[in-house]
Amino acid sequence: MPQLNPGPWFAILVFSWLIFLTIIPTKILSHISPNEPTPVSAEKHKTESWDWPW
């Protein structure tokens, strides 16, 4: 019975967890924060308030 041989199944299990723990978290984190944080010294855009003409 080849199902009782743990060799190939253990390798598949280890390889699949290796993929889950290395590749997938990086993809999830890239979707959670897609933009790099701006440094503190970056200039802020000066926006002026605009009123409706009525």
From Swiss-Prot:
The chain crosses the membrane at residues 4-24. GO terms for molecular function: proton transmembrane transporter activity. Residues 42-54 have a biased composition (Basic and acidic residues). The keyword Mitochondrion applies. Keywords: ATP synthesis, CF(0), Hydrogen ion transport, Ion transport, Membrane, Mitochondrion, Transmembrane, Transmembrane helix, Transport. It is a single-pass membrane protein. It comes from the Eukaryota. GO terms for biological process: proton motive force-driven ATP synthesis. The keyword Transport applies. Pfam families: ATP-synt_8. GO terms for cellular component: mitochondrial membrane; proton-transporting ATP synthase complex. It is found in: Mitochondrion membrane. Residues 35-54 are annotated as: Disordered. Subunit 8, of the mitochondrial membrane ATP synthase complex (F(1)F(0) ATP synthase or Complex V) that produces ATP from ADP in the presence of a proton gradient across the membrane which is generated by electron transport complexes of the respiratory chain. ATP synthase complex consist of a soluble F(1) head domain - the catalytic core - and a membrane F(1) domain - the membrane proton channel. These two domains are linked by a central stalk rotating inside the F(1) region and a stationary peripheral stalk. Component of the ATP synthase complex composed at least of ATP5F1A/subunit alpha, ATP5F1B/subunit beta, ATP5MC1/subunit c (homooctomer), MT-ATP6/subunit a, MT-ATP8/subunit 8, ATP5ME/subunit e, ATP5MF/subunit f, ATP5MG/subunit g, ATP5MK/subunit k, ATP5MJ/subunit j, ATP5F1C/subunit gamma, ATP5F1D/subunit delta, ATP5F1E/subunit epsilon, ATP5PF/subunit F6, ATP5PB/subunit b, ATP5PD/subunit d, ATP5PO/subunit OSCP. Belongs to the ATPase protein 8 family. This is ATP synthase F(0) complex subunit 8. It comes from Cyprinus carpio.
